[in-house]
Amino acid sequence: MTNPYNWIEKSLETLHKANWYRSVKTIHSRSGSVVNLKGNLVINFASNDYLGLAGDERLINASIDAIKQYGTGSTGSRLLSGHRPIHRELENAIASFKQTEDAIVFSSGYLANLGTITALVGQRDLILGDEYNHSSLKNGSKLSGATVLDYEHGNLEDLNTKLVNYRRSYRRCLILTDTVFSMDGDICPLPQLLDLAEDFNCMVLVDEAHATGVMGKTGAGCVEHLNCSGRELIQMGTLSKALGSLGGYVAGSFQLVEFLRNRAATWIYTTGLSPGDTAAALTALNIIQAEPQRRQQLWENVGLLKEQLSGFNLFPSETPIICLGLNTPTEALILAQKLQDGGIFAPAIRPPTVPTSRIRFTLMATHQPCHFQRLGAVIR
């Protein structure tokens, strides 16, 4: 009798042959622009901690205080025994920050997308998503049971064509897009997309994971950055990137949030966000609004990185995500290792995560000019 698990080993062999195999890289220090990787100090260009808050003493102390008051875990779902006053404080703060009526906090950003999409649409509905959307948007779409169609990346003509051809055949239509695309660094054309949604009576859910805390006059995200704050849409984001904590949120109308509390399975049937993570995120929101100089420094650092990488094949980017395009996974792995040997941590990103191989640099407000000089010396 054949072993029913033998296929796993063969699949791993295929990954190795294609140079698609992945393994973790262990960091042995606090989050920061310089970290301890395998016993060596390296400059960290791989973190989503855009504002350098994950290692901030104020977040750490807020988390400790919350743990002392409420314990380490929420111990139940929010609808049973897992709700604490600090959860509602955070949700109110997010709603104020995002200029929406209300907000709801999930235990992760991935869960926020899965739960929201599957609550909003079903078998009689249509989902139209940007082909470069995050995995959580794509998997939420599959789980919903709706008909799912991708439109070409950032191509609103293609989106319009699909709306003309298919919208009338479905009860509801949900358009999904990242606002900042995490593996490319570009931004969606949100104002025009919202115009299309209004023309065809569609809902819109935007993923602000890499925009929250970074984009916009106050750091509220691309919705603010693109002057769309007063328009009707659903805003999702994370607490784990610029906010330096863990969790996800959805912000929108009172009715939307009340509906999700009753229909989003990934909120109803999972343990509430831990008190420590909740307190850290709440503290980060306050810091982001009180210290705009962090964002200013981040944008200055974006300019410094682009100076050092002038002449290389950089993807178009208006964000702190800068990608250097390469021809093959092997080239990406070789360059990533060269950088690491020179004290630079910037991992290779390869298929199937992305269509083409690249080195992805993410910037932090806490990077120093000498870090960029070092990068320039190593990469050339």
Swiss-Prot record:
Pfam families attached to this UniProt entry: Aminotran_1_2 (PF00155)
Binding site for pyridoxal 5'-phosphate: G109, Y110, S182, D207, E208, A209, H210, T238, L239, S240, K241
Cofactor(s) this protein requires: pyridoxal 5'-phosphate
PROSITE patterns in the record: AA_TRANSFER_CLASS_2
E.C. number(s) listed in UniProt: 2.3.1.47
Keyword terms, alphabetized: Biotin biosynthesis, Pyridoxal phosphate, Transferase
Residues annotated with N6-(pyridoxal phosphate)lysine modification: K241
Keyword check for Transmembrane helix: no
GO biological process, one term: biotin biosynthetic process
GO molecular-function terms, A-Z: 8-amino-7-oxononanoate synthase activity; pyridoxal phosphate binding
UniProt: substrate binding residues: R22, H134, T353
Species, as recorded: Gloeothece citriformis (strain PCC 7424) (Cyanothece sp. (strain PCC 7424))
Family: Belongs to the class-II pyridoxal-phosphate-dependent aminotransferase family. BioF subfamily.
Catalytic activity as recorded in UniProt: 6-carboxyhexanoyl-[ACP] + L-alanine + H(+) = (8S)-8-amino-7-oxononanoate + holo-[ACP] + CO2
Subunit relationships: Homodimer.
InterPro entries found in the cross-reference section: Aminotrans_II_pyridoxalP_BS (IPR001917), Aminotransferase_I/II_large (IPR004839), AON_synthase_class-II (IPR050087), AONS_Archaea/Proteobacteria (IPR004723), PyrdxlP-dep_Trfase (IPR015424), PyrdxlP-dep_Trfase_major (IPR015421), PyrdxlP-dep_Trfase_small (IPR015422)
Function: Catalyzes the decarboxylative condensation of pimeloyl-[acyl-carrier protein] and L-alanine to produce 8-amino-7-oxononanoate (AON), [acyl-carrier protein], and carbon dioxide.
Pathway(s) the chain acts in: Cofactor biosynthesis; biotin biosynthesis
First-tier enzyme category under EC: transferase
Protein known as: Putative 8-amino-7-oxononanoate synthase
